[in-house]
Amino acid sequence: MSLRNERLNQILTEARPKIARHWSLYDGGFGHGGTAAAVAGVDELLVGYFGKLKDMPDGTPATTILHEIEMLLRGLAEVNASCGGAYLETDERDLLVPIIIEAATVAGLDANEFKDADPTLQFRAKLLIL
């Protein structure tokens, strides 16, 4: 396994308990307005995102990595909509966006090329998510 993929595995392994702990702070352990399906959906989307990044060869163009960020955020927007639009908000942004950016950076994206070093911002603004 490449060092890049080892690092991606490490990021996800460290993130999953933090995310689970976050959901546990809310009634029923699902987050505000969420369901077990929503929690599972977020987890599935994150695992899929990391899998896509790990499948990319070294030197993958930034546009390809950005596409995966956009697809992840579109999926998260769908999960949020399924919960009345109030499931993924500020606290979740503060939790998930750094994980998304760190993974993209490890995959080869230079986050410093984006406003506030946040390559998710353009998609979050368009999708009204996080």
PLM regions: where:
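Residue-level recognition of alpha-helical structural elements
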Residues: 38, 61-65, 85-92
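Short terminal alpha-helical segments
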Residues: 1-55, 127-128
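Generic alpha-helix signal with a bias toward terminal, lower-confidence helices
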Residues: 24, 57-58, 77, 88, ...
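Charged, amphipathic alpha-helical oligomerization/scaffolding segments
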Residues: 41-48, 68-71, 75-78, 95, ...
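Short secondary-structure junctions and interdomain/linker hinges
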Residues: 26, 56, 60, 79, ...
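Amphipathic alpha-helical binding modules
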Residues: 84-130
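Mature extracytoplasmic domains of secretory-pathway proteins
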Residues: 53-80
